[in-house]
Amino acid sequence: MVQVQRRTGGDKGAKGNRASSAPVRSRRMTQDDWSRTHPDDIFSVIEKTLVEDGYKWNGVKPGHCDWGKLKESGAIDNFRGTLEGELGKNCDLTCNAAAVKLDTLQKVKMSSDWTARVGIVLGAPGVGKSTSIKNLLDKFGAKHKMVLCLPFSQLLEGVFAGRLDTFLVDDLFCRSVGYGKYNTMLVDEVTRVHMCEILVLAGHLGVKNVICFGDPAQGLNYKAGSAVNYNFPIIAECYASRRFGKATADLINSSNGGGKPVVGNNEVKDSWTFEELCGKILDMSTVLVATRETQKFLLEDNIESILYSDAHGQTYDVVTIILEDEFDDAAICDPNVRAVLLTRARKGGMIKMGPNIAARFKNGDFNSRGVSKSCTGDTFCEDR
């Protein structure tokens, strides 16, 4: 969508094929020509913080976004169409939020000279993205006028609970916030939100710096609203998890469909067992499922479970993942669904599955039979 630099070849915007998600390497800079000469710049601050936290800093300049780029690329039209689609559904809170955003789109002054620098930070589950964000807010939030935007309410718990500088994206659209009150916007779990939504919000608030954190393995990145389609540079990345151990990392890597390999923490002792559907669930474990159909099926036997999309951003000591051939075959073919299910446990757990899905895990064969209907760039999650 929003092109950071001109390229020859087949890159297209929101209405065509997705642009490359590769970092922009042609504008590489060394530490000498930026962070050392601009130590107080927010991107220098973020570089220092993330490098200390174990991230690889890619040494690329942030991308730039303005109203002209958003309009010319088709991003605004795609976002408007998404919102109008939500209004046509039978819903309550989602429709109210969509109506507010549509109203904002109509009223915002797109002729203004607003421009923002944008960078993407990628990290595997458990690398400490939320902890790094919290550290940035604690140490530099006041000086750089930071605000943290979260796509769904579960993230308001845990390390972000009770913070006065942290809001849901929907809430910031609805609140009366003075233009220019915030200078830097941090976004967690960016793969769960339409990227144009973030950029419109930044323009609406007069934000000058947008830094988005996320795990590409947990987002449906082929959707038009995904951050990868905007070709913003990946400024930092880390794939060494502190949360889970080698067993979980091996399981993820054997079924990730060619994504970036993750590294487990050797100090964490985790394990996984695979069983048929019959039999008991692990004691004291949290039950996770891939579809609402399986969730309803289990509830008939008084087994409560958590849908994978509701577990996004959450962690549990031990999990039991239940996968029914009848309901879950298409969903488990989605690498994003697998990534969420397999990375919620700190100590591993058990996967109980039907014979067809068991064969998929054994053979590493997850050829897609369908598309997940989870939160994507083309639809918003009703529990936001």
Swiss-Prot record:
Its main location: host cell. ATP binds at G123, A124, P125, G126, V127, G128, K129, S130. Residues 239-384 form the (+)RNA virus helicase C-terminal domain. Signal peptide: none annotated. Disulfide bonds: none annotated. Residues 88-238 form the (+)RNA virus helicase ATP-binding domain. InterPro entries: (+)RNA_virus_helicase_core_dom, P-loop_NTPase. Pfam families: Viral_helicase1. PROSITE patterns: PSRV_HELICASE. Keywords: ATP-binding, Coiled coil, Host cell junction, Nucleotide-binding, Transport, Viral movement protein. GO terms for biological process: transport of virus in host, cell to cell. It is found in: Host cell junction, Host plasmodesma. GO terms for molecular function: ATP binding. One of its GO terms (cellular component) is host cell plasmodesma. Transmembrane segments: none annotated. It comes from the Viruses. SUPFAM superfamilies: P-loop containing nucleoside triphosphate hydrolases (SSF52540). Residues 1-36 are annotated as: Disordered. Belongs to the virgaviridae/benyvirus TGB1 movement protein family. Homooligomer. Interacts with movement protein TGB3. Transports viral genome to neighboring plant cells directly through plasmodesmata, without any budding. The movement protein allows efficient cell to cell propagation, by bypassing the host cell wall barrier. Engages in homologous interactions leading to the formation of a ribonucleoprotein complex containing viral genomic and messenger RNAs (vRNPs). TGBp2 and TGBp3 are necessary for intracellular delivery of TGBp1-containing vRNPs to plasmodesmata. This is Movement protein TGB1. It comes from Beet necrotic yellow vein virus (isolate Japan/S) (BNYVV).
